[in-house]
Amino acid sequence: MDTKIGAIDTCKPTTGDIGSPPSNAVATIQDSAPITTTSESTLGRHLSRRLVQAGVTDVFSVPGDFNLTLLDHLIAEPELNNIGCCNELNAGYAADGYARSRGVGACVVTFTVGGLSVLNAIAGAYSENLPVICIVGGPNSNDFGTNRILHHTIGLPDFSQELRCFQTVTCYQAVVNNLEDAHEQIDKAIATALKESKPVYISISCNLAATPHPTFARDPVPFDLTPRMSNTMGLEAAVEATLEFLNKAVKPVMVGGPKLRVAKASEAFLELADASGYPLAVMPSTKGLVPENHPHFIGTYWGAVSTPFCSEIVESADAYIFAGPIFNDYSSVGYSLLLKKEKAIIVHPDRVVVANGPTFGCVLMSDFFRELAKRVKRNETAYENYERIFVPEGKPLKCKPGEPLRVNAMFQHIQKMLSSETAVIAETGDSWFNCQKLKLPKGCGYEFQMQYGSIGWSVGATLGYAQATPEKRVLSFIGDGSFQVTAQDISTMIRNGQKAIIFLINNGGYTIEVEIHDGPYNVIKNWNYTGLVDAIHNGEGKCWTTKVRYEEELVEAIKTATTEKKDSLCFIEVIVHKDDTSKELLEWGSRVSAANGRPPNPQ
């Protein structure tokens, strides 16, 4: 957008000579013409333009009386598309999935009843370091501080409960209830989300969205962020200390962590991998951020449930570089990783810790890796060790005709579907482990929610990711228990012409909970899942459903979904035995159960 600075034309001299007095020889100072406010000069218009400039072209919304006027202004922006969702939780999950692809997402809900419904999704985005802009239509600005009791509140004159909840799961909160500083509040909120890679909360009073104001009268200066820079001396000191440590090591390795995304350092990480010759592994939540066709890629490091032979190489190394790791009870398999801090170089997005010793701050991850790549001594010892012990993975037995389908046989066929034109969304549960074993072709997307692990996340995330990346076909793997939490927004996928392939794995319960701690509460009511989706479809839009029980039926379903139904949303219910789980889930579940069951420390 062009930026117009001031009413310059109104200040020109009345003669043609620059700097000369007017022809009547009396010099006068003329005021700039007053700014005229129009329907273009509104808060809603400013917010919509800012969203587009930040990279958002779709917002996920649920209407409510406090946000209706704001939604009018958002849909009036020609470059912004409104995606109406069935509930606020899914709108938040969709913004999460969208941010994973686009780098930023946005959702719009109404005050408190909508805000507290979307809160769980925003907490998940916070845990996963995703910049999601959560916009809430708030009460009329005249109601603040009046002791009035409003609807959509808990019935107290103080209606700040929503704000206080969001303060714990967002990095910035803007309550816009006057127009004087609204411009600054909105800009600061969006800038903070992008800088911190965390969600922000913006509440906009319902009577302000359409109100013209001089601060919005001109197109804003195009949105931009000042690039962050490393401290030169700190960078040099960090590189020197790291080189001294690495050059003494015999068999160093590299492990990519999920904060590679936050730091935007995947390319720099690969530059170091190319230069060093070290084996290259990823933590489970990093899958998809590092190309698996790299010549030194050895798989997923996940402790006892790692890719075969990966943990042996990582845990036997005498030096490991971890790039943006997150160590929690899930990623550490119940705190059972065999790692030593004194062997680790931990590279955070903005600091480096060398061998549990000195910390070097104000050092950006990408700068650090690029500088290290220029000077590191090549050492392929650990990768050579990997090649010596590596044995190709066996293939599962093929199902006999009429034999019930096994999950491991199913994923052999899923592997053949993957390409640079697909993306994988893995729901919390056994899909985590089965999808981790897929070998991703270059350019194939991959997402799952490792830190927060909220079941049902994948339905909304599939909606958002597919909307952000229409050129890819999303393959989504969802358990029946998870699907029952958020099933409604299949409707939104159909409504918006999406063409994802959803594999609903029906094993009759919450399988991941079964393997941690079993009980009757983990058994769920079986649904007619294809019948449900057919009812949601209701003949409007393109949708195809099928049930499969045998391998030959799965092969036929995949063929149909990828040929004659390639332009439709495809829903494939895969019916498997309730005890058909991956060996990795069995191992992981027992270790997490042991961690959960630790007795209290003695007092």
Curated annotation (Swiss-Prot):
One of its GO terms (molecular function) is magnesium ion binding. Expressed in shoots and at lowe levels in roots, flowers and siliques. It is an enzyme of class 4 (lyase). Binds 1 metal ion per subunit. Binds 1 thiamine pyrophosphate per subunit. It comes from the Eukaryota. Induction: By abscisic acid (ABA), salt and osmotic stress. Not induced by anoxia. Belongs to the TPP enzyme family. Substrate binds at residues 65, 152, 513. Its cofactor is a metal cation; thiamine diphosphate. Keywords: Decarboxylase, Lyase, Magnesium, Metal-binding, Pyruvate, Stress response, Thiamine pyrophosphate. Homotetramer. This is Pyruvate decarboxylase 4. The keyword Transmembrane does not apply. Its EC number is 4.1.1.1. The keyword Hydrolase does not apply. InterPro entries: DHS-like_NAD/FAD-binding_dom, PDC/IPDC-like, THDP-binding, Thiamin_PyroP_enz_cen_dom, Thiamin_PyroP_enz_TPP-bd_dom, TPP-bd_CS, TPP_enzyme_TPP-bd, TPP_PDC_IPDC. Residues 430-512 are annotated as: Thiamine pyrophosphate binding. It catalyses: a 2-oxocarboxylate + H(+) = an aldehyde + CO2. Mg(2+) binds at residues 480, 507, 509. SUPFAM superfamilies: DHS-like NAD/FAD-binding domain (SSF52467), Thiamin diphosphate-binding fold (THDP-binding) (SSF52518). Pfam families: TPP_enzyme_C, TPP_enzyme_M, TPP_enzyme_N.
